[in-house]
Amino acid sequence: MYIQEMNSKFREKLRKSGLSKEMKSLESCDFFAFEEEDNFVVGAAGLGGLFHVSGIQILEKWRGKGLGKKLQSGLINEAKKRNYSFLTVFNDPRNIASEKMHNSLGYKTIFRIHYSKDIVNDVKIIVFKKRGIFIKKILEIFNSKVGMLILGILIKYSRKLFPRMILYSEENIPEPSIMNMITKFEKI
């Protein structure tokens, strides 16, 4: 496993592997933990954005072999070395393997977003320092119907701000249905 800062050379390497095509936000990360075979990237976990959002993508034939946990652990260790206070991740709760992996590494679910009928994400956090506890408390505001309404309005009408905060490019942020977010709300 390797740790790499994002630069144009590595961005091209990600594109050649096809990983950034499947997950555009990888190209926006500040740094990566990645694995390669024959100079070809087969899996990468990246970190970026104001909320230190972690993203992970592994080529299909490499899934189910523990690579995700290895990469995510590498990312967590590097974040600690760099003095990060916390990391967050957006995880589809229906992805059981990802759910188990993130939970086993210490991520805790703060709230769930039902963007639409088909798109659901749990927002998880792992805290390393006091500032991380403060951020967690702020994010817990969204674990209520009123908080979800506020989040829905923010996402819907402030889409241009979100890429900097949560790493995703604007086109990768799901279009929220505020009504769906409220009616399907689940307290965590």
Question: What residues fall within each predicted segment?
Answer:
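Conserved acetyl-CoA-binding loop-helix of GNAT-fold acetyltransferases
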Residues: 58, 64-77, 104
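Conserved catalytic-core motifs of GNAT/GCN5-like acyltransferases
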Residues: 90, 108-124
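Conserved beta-hairpin
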Residues: 29-43
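Conserved GNAT acetyl-CoA-binding A-motif
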Residues: 79-93
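Conserved active-site alpha-helix within GNAT-family acetyltransferase domains
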Residues: 93-111
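A short helix-loop-beta-strand connector motif used in the catalytic cores of GNAT acetyltransferases and
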Residues: 23-33, 52
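Short amphipathic alpha-helix that is part of the acyltransferase structural core
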Residues: 1-24, 41, 125, 137
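Conserved acetyl-CoA binding element of GNAT-fold acetyltransferases
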Residues: 49-60
